[in-house]
Amino acid sequence: MAQKLFIKTYGCQMNEYDSSRMADLLGESHSVELTDNPDEADILLLNTCSIREKAQEKVFHQLGRWKTLKEKNPNLLIGVGGCVASQEGDAIRDRAPYVDMVFGPQTLHRLPEMVNSVAHQKIPMVDVTFPEIEKFDRLPMPSSEGASAFVSIMEGCSKYCTFCVVPYTRGEEVSRPVDDVIAEIAHLAGQGVREVNLLGQNVNAYRGLTHDGDYMDLAELITYVASVDGIDRIRYTTSHPVEFSDSLIDVYASVPKLVSHLHLPVQSGSDRILNLMKRGHTVAEYTDKLRRLQEIRPDISLSSDFIVGFPGETDADFEETMNLINEIGFDHSFSFVYSARPGTPAANLEDNVSEEAKKQRLAILQQRILQFAQDISRKMVGSTQRILVTGVSKKDPGELQGRTENNRVVNFRSDSHDIIGRFVDVTITAALPNSLRGERVDSLDY
């Protein structure tokens, strides 16, 4: 009987991608089958994230639950991967000696060897090195069960913003060769994937080697991806404003398959705070790029990241952030109160903003962006949207679910499931707090 693998994932889309590749890897090497029940698993993997506060405590809390399973089944293998693993290394086993494997984002491709070593030699393994692109050289082609898929085109970040641990946990920027990226996307298209989301911690810093020895940037890569047969929708995330280039803006005019949605983290609307964060740009430079983009795509949906309560942030600084939000009209954000991450330069700054002020500012910010989101959703009522049907509605088996270009979930009634994985036109009939409702336009499907 095949061994069972359970993976619990914290964090970003890159971690979701990495977890899927772990499953592909061990499926090929050890014929394991995924399970959603940790109690029946032979291998437990925890893919961790260190971006937010108390990340380590969250990891050890989960490992404490798994310790009981290990006591019941001494042959159970427990592995910890991701950014907390990269950051903590041997310290994870010092605190949780029942953990068998510790590996970073750049060494997950070595999982088969780790599993063999632990299973046969009973020797725990810790490998949190940064072997650059070797990870992708040794991963099998991915499998996909849906019409949308993530494709990692680069790893790491070289920006070293003062608040961020990513350069220390995932390493410097390393881009995958163009041919490898296109081959993976073509493989996914052959499995029925219609939408790809190009991933990277700083994806618009992509500089991929071509087969003739030149380098290709993200704008050129998007043009190539658009030519892959079967791929009809392209997204990318996450971007940095400094490298949101003119050529990338121009590609929105030349590649219709690139969605009218952009997530461009700004973190703050105060130049003084941006300087303390070492973001490398001003608010004016950020807004200028968005204005030029809006000239090309007037209907583009814009989202961002915000940190409130960064050390030294005053009421005036926060007001400037709100002014930026009101000027741009973001319709979604990932927003958090500041918490110091160990080993980052900002951790040495005096955290002089009270928790009460942080929470109050966050509530104000999130409420304003929610208002923008609801306004945009209401304006979509009556319009016809091209929807990629992704599956059955979670709340009603008689309905199907899909996403618009601007990343809104749409539920609509359908007697047939044959259109799952296809594009259909849906007229929006209602805007709900977290989704849209619609009616399919039967004569127009793709």
From Swiss-Prot:
Reactions the enzyme catalyzes: N(6)-dimethylallyladenosine(37) in tRNA + (sulfur carrier)-SH + AH2 + 2 S-adenosyl-L-methionine = 2-methylsulfanyl-N(6)-dimethylallyladenosine(37) in tRNA + (sulfur carrier)-H + 5'-deoxyadenosine + L-methionine + A + S-adenosyl-L-homocysteine + 2 H(+)
Domain Radical SAM core: 143-375
Cofactor: [4Fe-4S] cluster
EC number(s) given by UniProt: 2.8.4.3
Subunit field text: Monomer.
MTTase N-terminal domain span: 3-120
Organismal lineage: Bacteria, Pseudomonadati, Pseudomonadota, Gammaproteobacteria, Oceanospirillales
Cofactor: record remark: Binds 2 [4Fe-4S] clusters. One cluster is coordinated with 3 cysteines and an exchangeable S-adenosyl-L-methionine.
Positions contributing to [4Fe-4S] cluster 2 binding: 157, 161, 164
Family: Belongs to the methylthiotransferase family. MiaB subfamily.
Localization annotation: Cytoplasm
Protein's UniProt name: tRNA-2-methylthio-N(6)-dimethylallyladenosine synthase
Gene Ontology molecular function: any one: N6-isopentenyladenosine methylthiotransferase activity
GO cellular component: cytosol
Function in brief: Catalyzes the methylthiolation of N6-(dimethylallyl)adenosine (i(6)A), leading to the formation of 2-methylthio-N6-(dimethylallyl)adenosine (ms(2)i(6)A) at position 37 in tRNAs that read codons beginning with uridine.
Pfam families from the UniProt entry: Radical_SAM, TRAM, UPF0004
PROSITE patterns, per the entry: MTTASE_N, MTTASE_RADICAL, RADICAL_SAM, TRAM
Annotated coiled-coil segments of the chain: none
Gene: miaB
Domain named TRAM: residues: 378-442
Binding residue positions for [4Fe-4S] cluster 1: 12, 49, 83
UniProt entry keywords in alphabetical sequence: 4Fe-4S, Cytoplasm, Iron, Iron-sulfur, Metal-binding, S-adenosyl-L-methionine, Transferase, tRNA processing
